[in-house]
Amino acid sequence: MKHSDNLRSVRSEYADADGSRCVYLTFDDGPNPLCTPPDI
């Protein structure tokens, strides 16, 4: 399955009757390792 196929299925599940989306999904990969101090 491609990434765009994933988004298409999410859109169809959360679309209103007229096709507009009312739910916004965000994806967080966690903190940026370059900006996060190392554990000591």
UniProtKB/Swiss-Prot annotation:
Q: Where is the signal peptide?
A: none
The primary location reported for this protein is: cytoplasm
All copies of domain NodB homology, residue ranges: 21-40
EC no. given is 3.5.1.-
InterPro entries in the record = NODB_dom
Query: What are the GO BP annotations of this UniProt entry?
Result: carbohydrate metabolic process
> Cross-referenced PROSITE patterns, in alphabetical order?
NODB (PS51677)
UniProt-annotated location(s): Cytoplasm
Query: What are the record's GO terms for cellular component?
Result: cytoplasm
Which keywords fit this entry according to its UniProt record?
Cytoplasm, Hydrolase, Nodulation
An example of a GO molecular function for this protein is:
hydrolase activity, acting on carbon-nitrogen (but not peptide) bonds
Residues at the active site: D28
Summarizing the function annotation, the protein's role is:
Is involved in generating a small heat-stable compound (Nod), an acylated oligomer of N-acetylglucosamine, that stimulates mitosis in various plant protoplasts.
Q: Which family does it belong to?
A: Belongs to the polysaccharide deacetylase family.
Give the protein's recorded name: Chitooligosaccharide deacetylase
- This chain's source organism reads Bradyrhizobium sp. (strain NC92)
